[in-house]
Amino acid sequence: MRREPHPFSGAIYEAIGDGLVRVDDPAKGKSGVFRYDGTWIEGELTHADPQLLLYVGGPDLPPGRDVYWGFLPPLEDEKTTMPAGGTLRAFENAGSQPPKVVGRYVGDPGVETPEGMRSSSHVPQDFLLENDRKRELLPAVYWKEAPYPGGPAKVPVARYHDKRFHDLEVEHIWKKVWQMVCREDDIPEVGDYHLYEIAHLQYLVVRTGPNEIKAHVNACLHRGRQLRECHGKKATEFRCPYHGWTWNIDGSMRLMTAEWDFPGVREDVSQLAGAKVHTWGGFVFINPDPDAIPFEEYTGPEMLEHYAKIKLQNRYKQADIVKVIRANWKVAMEAFLEGWHTLATHPQMLLAGTEVTDGRYDVFGNWGRLGHLTSGAASPNRGIIPSREQVLESHRATADFNREFLRGLIGEEVEQFTDAELNETSFSNLFPNFSPWGGWGRIVYRFRPSGDNPDECLMHVMLLAPWAEGKPKPPPREQRFLGPDDPWTLAPELGSLAKIFEQDCRNIPEIHVGLKTKQPPYIWYSAYQESVIRAFHDNYARRLGLAEGE
């Protein structure tokens, strides 16, 4: 059973079984019992932090699965090997855990910098880069800064629930942008295909050759019947179950039953309609727009350079989960486009000493880079602000640990990477909905509307484990589907991330409901910490042709 102090009050939250949590607050001399959903049961203490209640008393992982997601063994039958002498190993050997950091809330006053206001824990990124012990190996893009100008800014709430905006998205986004479909490893053999669904649009993405992938609209050219209703393997044709018209996997016509009754029609139905296809980093992308700009132009050079060294195409997909969320896809996605929410949403993470307050936020066209580098165990809202020298010392110690941990996974290839690359876990975003983490972070997010319902979405999470170049990979992990009421802990392959997602998804549906009643009917997004969200909405408004205030 879990037992945690609150990072601000020091009150002890202790699971007592059956989804109940006892909270003892010595400072107030009060205690109470609550359900993990926040419902008060008994006691003088009648209010407690709902997010910590959920973490302590909510759905839990099976024994042995509550492992930090970055240290999960790529394969379930393997064990994680920690570097000898590493910080975590030292605590394990001592039979204890790192001390929990508790401190009174004092607030973060911020600090003025040449680039604008930042958290008072701010350490210039160049300081860490200039003192990198392998500075000569740093990619040039690590030095580039591109904070998004302006802000704070208002965004109308109608964008999140009005069906009109969903319909505009279909026409001006989903029919026009490069969007991730699957991993190449998901369709490894000729004839393997993936059914990609976005709003009411459907595409069959099929491997037609060892180095060729095509995308076809999933509709018979006779009466429109879907050609396939799920993913599949080793297809040699796509035959319509209605009247038997059949196309080869490259989209060319194979058989037209009763052709005698369709004089002059064969030429019009001889090739399935399709979409452009591109592969990058082991991912498969499509763009339905025949006039679409090349993928490399869409992403911009900064994104391609940023990921080049880490070779996402070599990764092994160790987890693949899709969950239905009762919220608009933008509401869900924006919960993962800033780190500031850690303060209230994930209070247990503050017990390690950090708030994720000093990440760098950059915007390069369609690609936003979030949380590029952070300043160690700073917690400015509790007055914990380490010096630059302390930040650098922590940064290097973490890099040393990560280097030795990764050596066990990718061997001597790890020597190609700098301190900054070893520590980076930026949660970046390629417009509109694709977020592969940078550095050696394993997480990939994708958010899509669930059919034509603007009040529901699909949150897709993958974990891509480091994998040695040239080492044979087993088949990728099969996808797990979770319904709207299923807890993330039903996906133990996520490790500790499952508990974190439970907290995020405690907020997301309630945000969506609140936006429908909010007055005034707009959201304020901040100048810096929510700048990538502002950039997203500016891009969104341009593509949809929205007037000011829409």
Where are these regions (language model features)?
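A short beta-strand micro-motif
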Residues: R2-F8
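Short beta-strand micro-motifs enriched in acidic
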Residues: E14-D18, V206-T208, R448-D452
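A short, structured beta-strand/loop element
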Residues: E14-F34
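Mixed-charge, Lys/Arg-enriched low-complexity segments
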Residues: F34-E92, P99
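N-terminal pre-ligand scaffold of iron-sulfur
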Residues: P98, R104-C230, K276-T279
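C-terminal catalytic domain of Rieske-type non-heme iron oxygenases
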Residues: V102, G107-R118, H122, E212, ...
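Short Pro/Gly-enriched beta-strand edge/turn motifs at strand-loop
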Residues: K175-D186, M256-W260, T425-F431
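Rieske [2Fe-2S] iron-sulfur-binding domain
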Residues: D186-P290, P294-H306
